[in-house]
């Protein structure tokens, strides 16, 4: 059942991305009518370049924004040995290990592929979790590495950036351009205006949906690695019970953390990069019945 859950999650992500890419293509062709194809292609290249920068430098940016410090085995043998054992178990290269000096319990993984992976845990996380729970959390993070989630999120980020840029340019063209002279009907004008306003919101919602699916997948991958889903479920319950905002908050890297680091509230719930903790725990308990 656990393998089928992992496969189903990957299929869900693929379907979301497939439909999103088709929608982006349709919106792009529609926008090209108003912007001109040469300008449209320029925007696509600009968005792709922006995504590439994010892809290659995402690890360094995450470390800088979080204030994480790189450690060796002697600095924190407990965390280091946990990650090392998981690296051996999964067959992945040993990632760089970091600690974020922050009382808020949390952890994240970043890096464009397993060879450039970085994993980090906050000091608050290390204080409240026992060894099996810590292993469960770090197995979740190694799951992100194994599933190439940074690559997936970069693809989505590039598409969202392209949609945002195209939408902005189309709106400017509609407001300031003389589209009637180009033979565009009033109906076409309204349709393009509608999609230009709606597209960025829809793109953001797709990005959030993909992020939530990858969290479920990392949970399942981590549980399969340790063969002890209850440990991760217990850790998530502790993280929820001891949740507090990080001292160095950044909404741009909120999706990287195992627990949503943003302050609680209506908008956090509405635009969350993470699925509900209760549902994650329920699924992990269901997986636990398989062992």
UniProtKB/Swiss-Prot annotation:
Required cofactor names: Zn(2+)
Binding site residues for Zn(2+): 140, 144, 215
UniProt record, GO biological process: proteolysis
Keyword Protein biosynthesis in record: no
GO CC annotation, single: plasma membrane
Subcellular location: Cell membrane
InterPro entries (UniProt xref): HtpX_protease, Pept_M48_protease_HtpX, Peptidase_M48
Regions that span the bilayer: 11-31, 34-54, 155-175, 186-206
Topology in membrane: Multi-pass membrane protein
One Pfam entry name: Peptidase_M48
Keywords: Cell membrane, Hydrolase, Membrane, Metal-binding, Metalloprotease, Protease, Transmembrane, Transmembrane helix, Zinc
Cofactor binding annotation: Binds 1 zinc ion per subunit.
The family this protein is said to belong to: Belongs to the peptidase M48B family.
This protein's name: Protease HtpX homolog
Organism: Tropheryma whipplei (strain Twist) (Whipple's bacillus)
């Amino acid at each position: 059942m656990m393998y089928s859950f992992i496969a189903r999650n990957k299929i869900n992500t693929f379907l979301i991305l497939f439909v999103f890419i088709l929608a982006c293509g349709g919106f792009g062709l529609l926008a090209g009518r108003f912007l001109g194809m040469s300008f449209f292609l320029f925007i696509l290249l600009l968005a792709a370049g922006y995504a590439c920068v994010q892809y290659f430098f995402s690890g360094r940016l995450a470390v800088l924004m979080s204030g994480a410090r790189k450690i060796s085995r002697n600095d924190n043998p407990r965390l280091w040995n946990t990650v090392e054992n998981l690296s051996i178990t999964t067959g992945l290269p040993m990632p760089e290990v970091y600690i974020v000096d922050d009382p808020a319990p949390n952890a994240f993984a970043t890096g464009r592929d397993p060879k450039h992976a970085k994993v980090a845990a906050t000091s608050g996380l290390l204080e409240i979790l026992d060894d099996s729970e810590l292993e469960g959390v770090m197995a979740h993070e190694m799951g992100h590495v194994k599933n190439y989630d940074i690559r997936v999120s970069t693809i989505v980020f590039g598409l969202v950036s392209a949609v945002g840029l195209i939408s902005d340019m189309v709106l400017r063209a509609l407001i300031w351009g003389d589209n009637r002279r180009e033979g565009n009907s009033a109906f076409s004008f309204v349709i393009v205006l509608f999609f230009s306003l709606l597209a960025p919101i829809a793109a953001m919602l797709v990005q959030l949906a993909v992020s939530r699916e990858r969290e479920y997948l990392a949970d399942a991958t981590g549980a399969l690695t340790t063969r002890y889903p209850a440990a991760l479920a217990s850790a998530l319950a502790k993280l929820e019970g001891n949740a507090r905002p990080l001292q160095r908050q950044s909404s741009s890297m909120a999706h990287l953390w195992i627990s949503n680091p943003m302050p609680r509230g209506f908008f956090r719930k509405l635009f969350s990069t993470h699925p509900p903790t209760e549902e994650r725990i329920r699924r992990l308990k269901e997986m636990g019945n398989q062992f």
